């Protein structure tokens, strides 16, 4: 199945609408991409985004019975706030380094986050520069329980559709 992770639009109703659409399409989990609040491109396109408080995240979490993912976590404190908000899973991610220049990578912060969540029932995923199974294993050795791979699959899809994605999967 596929998880649907949406951007942190200003209006909660916009987020809930996208959750409902994803549920109807068969999503197995729903989430919010917190680091998307820093994306200037969204604002330039007239899309209102904003950071969310723990109370706002709790309210959004109540809108679905599916597992709830929060993406864009980069500190142990943020991870603990996500736990408080009711997240089932976090994605340690710096959004490909496109939100803040000089931001550490997932591998830099994973050990501290994993330590902070030790013993908690929260899944820790990570993304960023996963180009091989070895890259995935490195992130998992640092505390992730799984990884996300996006950009190489997009390259394959743009280049040759489904066949391109299959080629990327076979190559990596």
Where are the predicted features?
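N-terminal capping/small domains of soluble enzymes
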Residues: 1-10
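Short histidine
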Residues: 161-172
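Alpha/beta enzyme core
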Residues: 9-126, 133-156, 170
